[in-house]
């Protein structure tokens, strides 16, 4: 009989231990699973949209253009210029400016159309004396909506900023339009690192005789 009680006690202890171990293991598994579920259920936070900013001198892609029609001097042409730019008139020259960029329009009587040779031999030497650190002149003939035009590209320093004292290295595009004894020089300028290819094409393509 003593043997039977001992055996039963062993069986009971063994069963209880197994139940406790099973509960302990089951509890551990639930905690682990619960932890993983909470972690995977956390929604990813969306990244904020980057703020768009243009390099200094870049004309915005959404820039609006308006038609300039001169009312004095030679008035036989029109050209589109960026809306909102400040305008200055001095003699036969009208300038539109905004920060680091400018559109300069100069009219003059001319007995002959400008050529590669005339711009190279006459205009370039004049600009060397007028533009600080004038450099890299290149004369070509290009086509715009108004027809064939002589284009002079070059670089030079801007005027010193009266507030900051800074000087900007500028790139220039000078288009010489001609018709029936009248020449209109359209000069577009801005910082050399600015990407204004499209805006300047819009302006130069908009030139029209009337």
Roles of regions detected by a PLM:
Residues 111-113, 158-159, 183, 190-194:
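Solvent-exposed loop/turn segments at secondary-structure junctions
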Residues 103, 149-150, 184:
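Short, isolated positions in well-ordered beta-strands
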Residues 86, 125-132, 157, 205-209:
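Sec-exported extracytoplasmic/periplasmic mature domains
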């Amino acid at each position: 009989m003593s043997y039977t009680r001992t055996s039963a006690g062993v069986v009971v202890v063994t069963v209880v231990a197994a139940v406790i171990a099973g509960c302990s293991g089951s509890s551990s598994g639930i905690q682990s699973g619960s932890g993983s579920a909470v972690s995977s259920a956390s929604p990813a936070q969306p990244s904020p949209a980057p703020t768009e900013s243009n390099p200094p001198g870049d004309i915005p892609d959404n820039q609006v253009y308006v038609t300039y029609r001169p009312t004095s001097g030679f008035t036989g042409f029109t050209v589109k210029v960026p809306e909102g730019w400040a305008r200055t008139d001095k003699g036969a020259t009208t300038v539109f400016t905004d920060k680091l960029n400018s559109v300069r329009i100069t009219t003059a009587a001319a007995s002959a159309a400008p050529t590669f040779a005339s711009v190279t031999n006459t205009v370039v030497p004049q600009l060397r004396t007028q533009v600080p650190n004038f450099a890299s002149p290149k004369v070509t003939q290009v086509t715009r909506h108004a027809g064939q035009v002589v284009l002079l590209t070059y670089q030079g320093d801007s005027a010193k900023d009266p507030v900051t004292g800074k000087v900007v290295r500028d790139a220039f595009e000078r288009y010489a339009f001609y018709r029936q004894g009248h020449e209109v020089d359209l000069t577009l300028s801005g910082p050399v690192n600015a990407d204004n290819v499209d805006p300047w094409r819009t302006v130069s393509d908009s030139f029209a005789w009337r």
